[in-house]
């Protein structure tokens, strides 16, 4: 990739949880989610299963759907980009840090446009180690960083107090709003993550359709093949429910 003619690496970051849609005044769905702690692929399946095995949590999580209209708008933007743009598709947002360092070359600054339910500039957790919730801070320490966060009203309201890096930055609610304000933005690299610890498994079908379209569009693409498979949570939910039923029976017998 050419790096000598410019000083800034333009990055388009797409976290699939950006497309989560639910009533922004309904706290039930998020309260029923896992805590978002970084997990390996597969481990997060068990975590989700533990929530979905509970009738109340399962009902609340089911309220979350995919914003298909916004997903299509993002796809239209991707269709306008060069087919040779490097693309990485993976499970966790933490991998964007390494992807950027691989492509930064001699450039000394980074501009990240992050489509995300979360701003990912959190300081808590991880014992200071890189994770899916603090990678923005790592980039801010290592490079001159220009950061734009594109998020829905649900994401904006759920974030609470905003981090310093967003001070003075415009707010964008959609890719269309961002494009209108930044018509010349062209990404040098594109990062996509499924965010297994945040996106409910029932949204996998739309992600797979989107990811396979991306794979068919771009030539320089790589990633974790596990995120190109639908998560099979049902068997774990059944196991947990059966274990809970067994424990309840044993407790009932011992209490007599």
Describe the role of every protein-language-model region:
Residues 2-256:
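Conserved alpha-helical scaffold segments that buttress catalytic/binding sites
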């Amino acid at each position: 990739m050419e790096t000598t003619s410019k000083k800034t690496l333009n990055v388009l970051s797409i976290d699939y949880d950006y497309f989560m849609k639910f009533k922004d005044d309904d706290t039930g769905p998020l309260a029923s989610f896992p805590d978002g702690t970084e997990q390996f692929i597969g481990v997060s399946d068990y975590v989700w299963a533990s929530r979905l095995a509970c009738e109340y949590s399962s009902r609340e999580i089911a309220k979350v759907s995919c914003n298909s209209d916004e997903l299509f708008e993002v796809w239209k933007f991707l269709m306008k980009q060069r087919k040779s743009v490097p693309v990485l598709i993976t499970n966790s947002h933490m991998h964007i840090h390494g992807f950027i360092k691989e492509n930064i070359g001699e450039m000394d600054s980074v501009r990240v446009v992050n489509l995300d339910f979360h701003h990912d500039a959190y300081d808590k957790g991880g014992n200071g180690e890189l994770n899916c919730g603090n990678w923005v801070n790592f980039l801010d320490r290592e490079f001159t960083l220009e950061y734009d966060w594109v998020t829905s009203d649900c994401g904006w309201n759920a974030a609470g107090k905003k981090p310093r890096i967003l001070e003075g930055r415009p707010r964008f609610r959609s890719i269309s709003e961002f494009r209108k304000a930044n018509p010349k933005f062209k990404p040098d690299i594109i990062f996509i993550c499924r965010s297994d610890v945040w996106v409910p498994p029932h949204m996998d079908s739309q992600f797979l359709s989107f990811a396979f379209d991306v794979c068919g569009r771009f030539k320089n693409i790589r990633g974790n093949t596990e995120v190109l498979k639908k998560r099979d949570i049902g068997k774990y939910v059944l196991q947990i429910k059966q274990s809970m039923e067994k424990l309840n029976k044993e407790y009932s017998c011992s209490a007599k």
